[in-house]
Structures are given as structure tokens and as C-alpha cells.
Design a protein with these regions (language model features):
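Active-site neighborhood of divalent metal-dependent phosphoester bond hydrolases
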Residues: 40-99
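N-terminal active-site segment of His-dependent metallophosphoesterases
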Residues: 1-50
Length: 99
């Protein structure tokens, strides 16, 4: 069994896929992701979908990062949505088909 820690993916699905191909997680492995799955990179949606797939093959502990927190706060009125959009939220929205 291995414990694998991954941080700051930031919407970079190609890099995540390369990493997953390299480490080739098995059902005995534990992966801890440190948040910041979204924003900045071109495929936040793909990153989220890939992590959901990974969770069916091994134990995954996804933690929330500051970018996920900022997105949630902007949706709940805790921070200006423009702050989130300026910090990579635009790329996240585009990955879900919003322009």
C-alpha cells in the first residue's frame, strides 16, 4: 500500500493524467488530494470527472483548497464573484461550457 499526495491540479487534466499513468494507482493505494482542482487550467471539469473515476479504483481523500472555497463563497455571497472569476474562475466556467 502506498499513500500518494497530490496538490494544486488547477484544471490541468493532461498533467493529472500523466501523473496517474506514472504512479498507476492500485486498489490498495490511498490518494490524498490537497485541493485546488479548479481554476486557471483549461479543464477543471475534466479534472473533477477524472478524480471521481479514480475514486472507484482506490481510496481517495479529496480535501478542499482555497480555490474551491473561493468559488463556494462567491456563490453564497461571501465574496464578490468577480474576485473568483479573476482568480481562475473564468477558466472553470468555460470548462463547463459557460462563456
Amino acid at each position: 500500500m502506498r499513500t500518494i499526495v497530490i496538490g494544486d491540479i488547477h484544471g490541468c487534466l493532461a498533467a493529472l493524467d500523466t501523473l496517474l499513468d506514472t504512479i498507476a494507482p492500485t486498489s490498495e493505494d490511498v490518494i490524498v488530494t490537497l485541493g485546488d482542482y479548479i481554476d486557471r487550467g483549461p479543464d477543471s471539469r475534466g479534472v473533477i470527472e477524472r478524480l471521481i473515476q479514480v475514486s472507484s479504483h482506490c481510496t481517495l481523500y479529496p480535501l478542499m483548497g482555497n480555490h474551491e472555497e473561493m468559488m463556494l463563497l462567491s456563490l453564497q455571497g461571501g465574496v464578490s464573484p468577480f474576485r473568483w472569476l479573476q482568480n481562475g474562475g473564468t477558466e472553470t466556467m468555460e470548462s463547463y461550457g459557460f462563456t
